[in-house]
Amino acid sequence: MESIPISVEGFRRLERELERLKKERPGVILAIKEAREEGDLRENAGYEAARERQGMLEARINYIESRMSRFNVIDLATLGGEQVIFGATVEIEDVDTGDVKKYTLLGPDEAEPSKGSISLLSPVGLALLGKFVGDEIVVDAPRGKINYEIVSIAFHGPIAAADD
């Protein structure tokens, strides 16, 4: 089984989520029991909603648990260098438009593009891995191929924990 990189903070966030989800289980089971006692299950919206919630809850618990043993937990504070690797914050410039973007490369289970972090397994992440300042990459995007130049590579240590 292939390991999955994740920051210490990302791992802790998933541990907290798993703990919270497991604490929700009894309440969902109780909601199902109470809805079942209301009678006819074919037209019982409360029962259907509780069963749906249980399904989503169990699916997320199973997903997280299946990933936990495969994680390669990496302390971002120990990273550095001149090459793009997991944990690097990379500034890239669109060669054609001059638009500049900044991304931190993280694992697929903690990447949040809206907050500036992308998965190292995303098309941009894969194109950046192993590159240096001044290198150019080409990314296939819906609007066509985009050429970027790597402007800077930095390592900032632990990322700020997102509010849970």
UniProtKB/Swiss-Prot annotation:
GO terms for molecular function: DNA binding; RNA polymerase binding. Pfam families: GreA_GreB (PF01272), GreA_GreB_N (PF03449). SUPFAM superfamilies: FKBP-like (SSF54534), GreA transcript cleavage protein, N-terminal domain (SSF46557). InterPro entries: GreA/GreB_C_sf, TF_GreA/GreB_CS, Tscrpt_elong_fac_GreA, Tscrpt_elong_fac_GreA/B, Tscrpt_elong_fac_GreA/B_C, Tscrpt_elong_fac_GreA/B_fam, Tscrpt_elong_fac_GreA/B_N, Tscrpt_elong_fac_GreA/B_N_sf. It comes from the Bacteria. One of its GO terms (biological process) is regulation of DNA-templated transcription elongation. Keywords: Coiled coil, DNA-binding, Transcription, Transcription regulation. PANTHER family: TRANSCRIPTION ELONGATION FACTOR GREA (PTHR30437:SF4). HAMAP family: GreA_GreB (MF_00105). Belongs to the GreA/GreB family. This is Transcription elongation factor GreA. It comes from Solidesulfovibrio magneticus (strain ATCC 700980 / DSM 13731 / RS-1). The gene is greA.
